[in-house]
């Protein structure tokens, strides 16, 4: 499948208005606008690769334009949307930012509620991660340097997939080595479930604890970077604080970054070129991958 390459042209026109959309709270429009500069980036993209038979089981691979001397880290990213909505096409700016940082990046779709309930989207996450590990070498990546990353609901997928080994084991392949987890504004400790659709999605009630990453912390978990905005009204900062504390109590290396005056969307929006001044998300990701890859 041929790749499309971003052109090195002026980004000024494409970037105009993105910041205003986010500041106005138009997050959906902001994410769409954030992809405008990504079109002009220095990377290769392989789009709509199937990792399963369902229409939503598709992923895009982004890789640096320049060849590497040695295999690169591989980052698998899942979008947010309360497990109900979202699409990888909205997050081209994430793939571009990470590829331009030197990582082979996989941006994966997954089935949403109500098409599936728990554990349906976890099964999709497992399949995407296994696909990324199995095919990393085809894109210049190292399967032993695999990072799982997500924003909001996607961060929940990344954390639970890493901490609860049942999902990767059930996929029928040898579980890959996970070098680290990068969670942006993730829900990790969100009981009780108050909304009827949440209760249905994660139910029945005896199964509610199965949805909580914090209930599966273990001493052999890989290093984690947990990023949270202190102005997040969608996923409270206690989620990242509590998971970090539980992991640290077991001796797991955790980097907790709490950004003042940063919202739920800001942590991921800061990966697009114009908005990188809003939060140091990309710099913290680069530092984390650099440390944990040594």
Where are these regions (language model features)?
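Short beta-strand element of the alpha/beta-hydrolase
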Residues: 71-80
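C-terminal catalytic histidine-bearing segment of alpha/beta-hydrolase fold enzymes
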Residues: 249-294
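N-terminal cap/lid segment of alpha/beta-hydrolase-fold proteins
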Residues: 31-67
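Primarily recognizes the serine-hydrolase "nucleophile elbow" in alpha/beta-hydrolase
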Residues: 133-194
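N-terminal secretory signal peptides
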Residues: 1-9, 16-24
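Short beta-strand/loop motif that positions the catalytic acidic residue
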Residues: 226-228, 232
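Catalytic nucleophile-loop/oxyanion-hole region of alpha/beta-hydrolase
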Residues: 86-94, 106-143, 275-276
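Mobile cap/lid helix-loop segments that gate and shape the active-site cleft of serine hydrolases
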Residues: 54, 186-216, 222
């Amino acid at each position: 499948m041929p790749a499309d390459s971003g052109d090195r042209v002026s980004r000024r026109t494409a970037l105009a208005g993105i910041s205003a959309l986010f500041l106005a709270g138009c997050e959906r429009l902001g994410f769409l606008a954030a992809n405008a500069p990504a079109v002009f980036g220095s990377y290769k993209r392989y789009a709509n690769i199937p990792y399963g038979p369902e229409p939503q089981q598709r992923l895009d691979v982004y890789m640096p334009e320049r060849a590497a001397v040695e295999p690169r880290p591989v980052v698998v990213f899942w979008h947010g949307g309360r497990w109900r909505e979202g699409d990888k096409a909205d997050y081209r700016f994430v793939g571009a930012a990470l590829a331009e940082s030197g990582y082979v990046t996989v941006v994966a779709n997954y089935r949403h509620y109500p098409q599936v309930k728990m554990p349906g989207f976890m099964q999709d996450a497992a399949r995407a991660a296994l696909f990324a590990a199995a095919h990393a070498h085809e894109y210049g990546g190292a399967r032993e340097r695999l990072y799982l990353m997500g924003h909001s609901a996607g961060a929940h997928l990344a954390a639970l997939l890493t901490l609860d080994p049942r999902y990767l084991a059930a996929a029928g392949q040898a579980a890959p080595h996970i070098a680290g987890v990068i969670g942006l504004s993730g829900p990790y400790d969100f009981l009780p479930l108050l909304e009827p659709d949440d209760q249905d999605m994660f139910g029945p009630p005896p199964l509610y604890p199965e949805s909580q990453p914090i209930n599966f912390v273990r001493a052999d978990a890989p290093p984690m970077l947990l990023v949270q905005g202190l102005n997040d009204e969608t996923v409270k900062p206690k989620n990242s604080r509590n998971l970090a504390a539980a992991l640290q109590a077991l001796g797991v290396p955790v980097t907790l970054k709490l950004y003042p005056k940063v919202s739920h969307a800001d942590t991921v929006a800061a990966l697009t070129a114009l908005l990188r001044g809003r939060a140091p998300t990309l710099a913290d990701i680069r530092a984390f991958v650099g440390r944990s890859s040594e």
